[in-house]
């Protein structure tokens, strides 16, 4: 009887599932990004970005192509003329990196940053 009442109560009173709020500024080093694992942080600078919902990933791919420093490979950095090394963000929610010259001090500082950890 109790199981029947529990089952019928979920049918009669469905719970509303809230969509993640994927707005505002974020850091590509923040895990999870934008305070939700349902969102992604798209860098617009080395340490700052904006939150999006993954349904907008086609626009993100276009933005990565057009941004001079966002990359997915060393070759892409060389094609864009932004460096010769694509340093990946230490965040498994971000599928791209930032272009650097392989002998630059900025790259050494970027690589010295602590790796983000998932909880």
UniProtKB/Swiss-Prot annotation:
* Domain characteristics, as noted in the entry: The presence of a 'disulfide through disulfide knot' structurally defines this protein as a knottin.
Query: Where on the tree of life does the source sit, at the highest rank?
Result: Eukaryota
Q: Where do the TM regions start and end? A: none
**Lineage, highest ranks first:** Eukaryota, Viridiplantae, Streptophyta, Embryophyta, Tracheophyta
Q: Propeptide residue ranges? A: 57-64, 118-119
Keyword list (alphabetical) reads: Disulfide bond, Knottin, Seed storage protein, Signal, Storage protein, Toxin
**PTM statement from Swiss-Prot or TrEMBL:** The C-terminal glycine may be removed from A1b.
What is the protein name given in its UniProt record? Albumin-1
């Amino acid at each position: 009887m109790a199981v029947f009442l529990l089952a019928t109560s979920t049918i009669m009173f469905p719970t509303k599932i809230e969509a993640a709020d994927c707005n505002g500024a974020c850091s590509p080093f923040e895990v999870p990004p934008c305070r939700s694992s349902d969102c992604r942080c798209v860098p617009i600078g080395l340490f700052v970005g904006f939150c999006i919902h993954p349904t907008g990933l086609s626009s993100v791919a276009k933005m990565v192509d057009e941004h001079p420093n966002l990359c997915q490979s060393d070759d892409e950095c060389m094609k864009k003329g932004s460096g010769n090394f694509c340093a990946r963000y230490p965040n498994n929610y971000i599928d791209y990196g930032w272009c650097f010259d392989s002998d630059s001090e900025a790259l050494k500082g970027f690589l010295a940053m602590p790796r983000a950890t998932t909880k």
